[in-house]
Amino acid sequence: MKRQSDPKKGALTGPSQRQLRAGELIRHALVEILREEELQDEALQNISVTVSEVRMSPDLKHAICFVEPLGAGLTGQDTTDIIKGLNRVSKFLRGRLGRSIDMKFTPDLKFIHDESFGTAAYMDKLFLDPRVQQDTRRLSDVVDDEDEA
């Protein structure tokens, strides 16, 4: 999502408070809809999905939903199929969403796989590496020595 620039400061700013509030409202509503509804897409049968973030466009007419399929044994292809399935039923989800939230416009939904869970798992694995732990111990010893001086 493109960040908005502030003409006064010339710097990039993040999403507005309104976008953040609308995104959280939609995220909560989507979680409930996905939990309660029996979606007809074959890729979504007996699948649990977590919605980690919803980013809204400045006009609140488009929403990018970051999701992570849950379950042991899911392959990358399974995840891709689930994301494609969610995008196929996005019009249905938009209709249900329109009935459960109070907004002037119900946004178009686009689902994207949330890579942050994989990144966090990789970082955890990396920090457990003995060589990295050895380096972090050395760094903390140097910082402790500087604090004493």
UniProtKB/Swiss-Prot annotation:
Keywords: Cytoplasm, Ribosome biogenesis. GO terms for molecular function: ribosomal small subunit binding. Pfam families: RBFA. The keyword Cytoplasm applies. Monomer. Binds 30S ribosomal subunits, but not 50S ribosomal subunits or 70S ribosomes. Belongs to the RbfA family. This is Ribosome-binding factor A. It comes from Caulobacter vibrioides (strain NA1000 / CB15N) (Caulobacter crescentus).
